[in-house]
Design a protein with these regions (language model features):
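Residues immediately within or flanking Cys/His clusters that coordinate Zn2+
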Residues: 7, 26, 115
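Short cysteine-rich clusters marking metal-coordination/redox-active sites
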Residues: 10-13, 29, 118
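Cys/His-rich metal-chelating microdomains
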Residues: 16, 32-33, 121
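Short amphipathic, basic-aromatic surface patches that mediate peripheral association
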Residues: 64-72
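Short, non-ligating residues that shape and space the ligands of small metal-coordination modules
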Residues: 19-20, 35-36, 124
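Exposed aromatic-hydrophobic patches
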Residues: 63-64, 101-108
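Short acidic/polar inter-strand loop motif in beta-rich domains
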Residues: 119-126
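Cysteine-rich micro-motifs
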Residues: 23-34
Length: 126
């Protein structure tokens, strides 16, 4: 069964999707169910993957890791997402290997959660 705002990856082709509406049926790709990605479950350097959220005037800056995550053509952060605790605000910033591992979001939401996706080490939440 699909989870609202869940991130799913196809084990066959590597497609990644996020469920924005509905909770049924299971998310399918390549004729099979997609795997739900669970945050912070890959064995990797936590200090380089857990997003760090900083409140700034008019919004937030999300830095990937307390130690900056490497950004190279073979290992990088693909995107950073900020969601309000109530789920009413969702914004994602796509990154390239030449970008810094951070993103700025404009919102007046008081309580937020950040997630990021590393091309090698999966989904992380902070």
């Amino acid at each position: 069964m699909a989870e609202l705002l869940g991130i799913y990856k196809c084990a066959k082709c590597g497609n990644i999707v996020q469920v924005l509406h509905g909770e049924k049926p299971p998310v399918m790709c390549c004729g099979q169910g997609m795997d739900r990605l669970v945050e912070n479950t890959v064995d990797a350097a936590v200090e380089k993957h857990v997003p760090v959220v900083e409140k700034i005037e008019g919004g937030y800056v999300v830095k990937v890791g307390s130690v900056p995550h490497p950004m190279g053509s073979d290992h990088w952060i693909e995107w950073v997402e900020l969601t309000s605790e109530d789920g009413m605000f969702i914004q994602r910033q796509m990154l390239t290997p030449s970008d810094a591992p951070e993103a700025t979001f404009k919102t007046d939401a008081e309580k937020v959660v950040a997630r990021e996706y590393c091309n090698l080490h999966g989904l992380w939440k902070g």
